[in-house]
Amino acid sequence: MSEQKVALVTGALGGIGSEICRQLVTAGYKIIATVVPREEDREKQWLQSEGFQDSDVRFVLTDLNNHEAATAAIQEAIAAEGRVDVLVNNAGITRDATFKKMSYEQWSQVIDTNLKTLFTVTQPVFNKMLEQKSGRIVNISSVNGLKGQFGQANYSASKAGIIGFTKALAQEGARSNICVNVVAPGYTATPMVTAMREDVIKSIEAQIPLQRLAAPAEIAAAVMYLVSEHGAYVTGETLSINGGLYMH
């Protein structure tokens, strides 16, 4: 087994995912990044923009809505690296609509991507961690999974489900030194958010006691705390990083 620690990250190429990968690589981790579809140009551009070497990241083609194929791909990647120390379930989508107007497709797309795929990704990783008798899993939820959000019944349900899943899995993993936690970000200055109109951003910031969006680095730092030696006595918890938008 390699001495280098390995982290599997879903949604690795997104705004928050990229920063999580950056901080993990800086801490000495090898990254297994799930992607669909494989796009060599995009992957190379991402590696260059993040300052990564090819050896820092193993890209794995995983259509997370194809359970058998995705499971096999993840198992193959873990076998190739010989270990997996950290899992960050970060992939997620939105399909916003009021519940009255929400289609079954909009509901299913979000539940399947944000919640159902947790089983597909986590089970092969969790089983390897049980074998190793160690591991850290961090699931990325959302402030809206805690408080709910108008027009996001599907998204809020999926992100709340992540929290319940985490609490249950934390109890199963504890005896094998596997810590399972949630990071629940508030509004974060990812490219998708900062591309919104300035007046929309200002209206969001006005609702936040700290009067600003989170930086992706602040979300990633919370993840890094939970996977570090300093987070070794934390499990089944939800770490809210929302600037005071929701206090509970």
From Swiss-Prot:
Family annotation (InterPro entries): Acetoacetyl-CoA_reductase (IPR011283), NAD(P)-bd_dom_sf (IPR036291), Sc_DH/Rdtase_CS (IPR020904), SDR (IPR050259), SDR_fam (IPR002347)
Keyword Oxidoreductase annotated: yes
Binding-site residues for NADP(+), renumbered to this chain: 14-16, 42, 90-94, 185-188
Pathway assignment: Biopolymer metabolism; poly-(R)-3-hydroxybutanoate biosynthesis
Active site residues of this protein: 155
Coiled coil in keyword set: no
SMART domains, per the entry: PKS_KR
Family: Belongs to the short-chain dehydrogenases/reductases (SDR) family.
Protein name: Acetoacetyl-CoA reductase
Originating gene: phaB
